[in-house]
Design a protein with these regions (language model features):
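Active-site neighborhood of phospho(di)ester-bond hydrolases with catalytic His/Asp-centered motifs
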Residues: 27-39, 58-60, 139-145, 163-168, ...
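Binuclear metal-ion centers of metallo-dependent hydrolases, dominated by the metallo-beta-lactamase
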Residues: 56, 71-87, 180-271
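Active-site environment of divalent metal-dependent phosphoester hydrolases
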Residues: 37-41, 64-67, 84-87, 101-104, ...
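Pre-active-site segment of Zn-dependent metallo-hydrolases
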Residues: 1-36, 44-48, 102-114, 120, ...
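Structured loop/turn residues at beta-strand edges in well-structured enzyme cores
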Residues: 26, 72-75, 89-91, 125, ...
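Beta-strand-turn-beta hairpins that frame and shape the catalytic cleft
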Residues: 85-94, 133-139
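Active-site-proximal loop/helix segments of hydrolase catalytic cores
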Residues: 44, 114-190
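Local beta-strand N-terminus motif with an aromatic residue
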Residues: 28, 54, 159-160, 192
Length: 271
């Protein structure tokens, strides 16, 4: 981003709380990294999973260097490229092309001195999207992709139930995320049944409003549902397929433990 804007420094203020403690995770089959950026190939997540689980660490070729730097054993690293297919238990994972043009210029070398043939190979080495085919439904993870006509290709090649699509509001002079209309269009091209917007709340500099995506989808009579989730909530497919919001389950579940006969108030109608 510094490279694309010419800024001397960037202020990546995190604007969403950490709602999961990685050290509390004791069971994990695979850690899938979409690309080399530190918020998607994260030391503070990798280390706990390395120590407390037997999971595989999966990612594009250039993430292998990062995994090894974090002391992940070679036999737990799975390097993949577009077109590769592998299984983790009953989930078939397809590595497909990424369209993350920001990661494409995350490079120490002088980009002007890289031959176009070599430059064209960088994306596949540094970033991937994933299609997870499960017995119950299929999930598409767009990583940090920008909008691309290739979403249409992926929609023709795979049946997508849920599309996880990054978007945000870009500052003037900077394009790091898809905008709300891009996110709508990506999900439509993928033929998704549900669009779950993501990454819009991670960084203050590109913080977006997911109801903008919902508004566009409603205006365009989108053939999919936009589901907006609160941080730390859980989406269950297909039970939640028609839900437009996922709230904290405690709001419902906690009432089951209330006992009206034990209420202790000054008089019954106090509250």
């Amino acid at each position: 981003v510094v490279r694309m804007t010419g800024a001397e420094k960037m202020y990546w203020l995190r604007s969403v709380p950490h709602v999961i403690d990685p050290w509390a995770i004791k069971e994990c089959d695979a850690y899938l990294s979409t690309h080399i950026h530190t918020d998607h190939c994260d030391f503070y997540t990798i280390k706990p999973l390395l120590e407390n689980t037997n999971c595989k660490f999966v990612g594009p070729i250039r993430t292998k260097e990062i995994f090894e730097r974090f002391k992940v054993p070679k036999d737990r690293i799975v390097s993949v490229k577009p077109g590769d297919v592998f299984r983790i238990k009953d989930v078939e994972i397809h590595a497909v092309e990424s369209f993350d043009r920001t990661v494409l210029i995350t490079e120490q070398a002088d980009l002007r001195k890289i031959a176009m043939e070599e430059f064209a190979k960088l994306m596949d080495q540094k970033a991937l999207n994933y299609v997870l085919r499960t017995p119950y439904g299929n999930v598409y993870d767009a990583g940090d992709s920008h909008y691309s006509n290739m979403f249409f290709k992926h929609g023709k090649e795979h049946e997508i139930d849920i599309a996880l699509v990054t978007f945000g509001d870009n500052p003037d002079g900077m394009t790091d995320k898809m905008n709300p209309y891009d996110a709508y269009r990506a999900a439509k091209c993928l033929g998704a049944k549900v669009l779950i917007p993501m990454h819009y709340e991670n960084w203050g500099i590109v913080e977006g409003d997911p109801t903008d995506v919902e508004m566009i989808a409603n205006k365009k009579f989108a053939p999919f549902t936009v589901c907006i989730m609160r941080p730390g909530t859980k989406y269950v497919w297909p039970k939640d397929k028609d839900k437009r919001r996922i709230y904290y389950s405690q709001q419902v579940e906690v009432s089951r433990h209330f006992r009206p006969e034990l209420v202790d108030l000054p008089f019954p109608a106090y509250l």
